[in-house]
Amino acid sequence: QEPQPEQDPFELSGKWITSYIGSSDLEKIGENAPFQVFMRSIEFDDKESKVYLNFFSKENGICEEFSLIGTKQEGNTYDVNYAGNNKFVVSYASETALIISNINVDEEGDKTIMTGLLGKGTDIEDQDLEKFKEVTRENGIPEENIVNIIERDDCPA
């Protein structure tokens, strides 16, 4: 496998839809869970060292919209406060997919490792899904802990 060229995060900005999420703790991504996240857009602002996230999460079938601002750290890692502290990195990027790896430490101090596959729409290329499964395994998450989020997303576009 050839190493991925360093992506310019600015070029990755735009509309992104959550396709799949993997988690070391399935309760974090299940029904009514905080990380069953329906992403809508990500804007990377290198000048200000910020990232802007817009997404929905559902509780009791009700979609709630979130707009969060994260701060860029060393090594293209971003810190975002949401259901605890999160450190995420873009593990892989193509024109049609983003794969994000996230470490969440919740209010109780419990650590959860998550991966997300985001697409420009609801169709995901086979090679992007395979790459996502590979990144998920590399993060120590078993394949049975991957959830199809597209099928659950009925929040506003």
UniProtKB/Swiss-Prot annotation:
Record-linked InterPro entries: Calycin, Lipocalin, Lipocln_cytosolic_FA-bd_dom, OBP-like
Gene Ontology MF terms in the entry: odorant binding; small molecule binding
SUPFAM superfamilies: Lipocalins (SSF50814)
A biological process term (GO) from this entry: sensory perception of smell
Sequence similarity: Belongs to the calycin superfamily. Lipocalin family.
Subunit-structure text: Monomer.
Name of the protein: Odorant-binding protein
Organism this protein belongs to: Sus scrofa
